[in-house]
Amino acid sequence: MITARDYQGRVNGIFGQPKLIVDGMNGPNTSAGISQAMAKMGVRRKEDLFNRGVRGVVWHWTAGANGLIELEKKAYNFLHDTKGNTYDGNATVAEQVMYDWRRGIGASHTKSMNTGWIGLSVDAMAGAKQTNPITWGSHPITWSGIDAMLEQTANLHHEYVFPISPWTTLSHAEVQPTLGVKQRWKWDYTVLPGDTKSRDPVEVGNIPRERLTERFL
């Protein structure tokens, strides 16, 4: 089921601005925004604002060391090592659209926001802590790993035609402030390689979105 929150985020992504408050309430403003987005995209059914049910992409890091383990492959649809290689997770995009944790369908990568959301993760940040300055641990994120994640996002964007925006391509740390879905103190990504302290997640998320657009689209 596509939720009101999904529609609100998609409308904002299509228009590239916060046209609707993402609050999960399907009121007159949301209905009007959906109608305007349908007109802009040339579709007759509101469900067709989503290509094959894909809502968007959430960017993560695994908090893992070098080398993929089964738990990580189960948790994400795609993984990327710090050298820039990309690996398939256990769940396909089609399975993610049909997400059902009770039946073991899809990856559970984001609390209360998995159906149709594709989880991409850099396999890194073992031992990292959100201290000031940052404790980077034994296996920090790299731009090579992030770029692999962004390139895969671009590939998915071309296939499933979702907007590149703060509402549809965002980090785990942006989910709560941007889409209002409560998370458990997630800080991926509030830092990028070379940072010494955490920053606002949306400010940080704008950097890979801009990098994605400039380098991979």
For every predicted segment, state its role.
Residues 1-44, 160, 167:
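Short acidic, glycine/serine/threonine-rich helix-capping segments at coil-helix boundaries
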Residues 3, 32-36, 50-51, 125-217:
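Basic/polar, cationic surfaces and motifs that engage anionic cell-wall
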Residues 12, 64, 176:
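Alpha-helical and His/Cys-centered functional microenvironments
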Residues 18, 26-29, 44, 91, ...:
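Compositionally biased, intrinsically disordered low-complexity regions
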Residues 40-165:
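Active-site-adjacent loop/helix surface patches within enzyme catalytic domains
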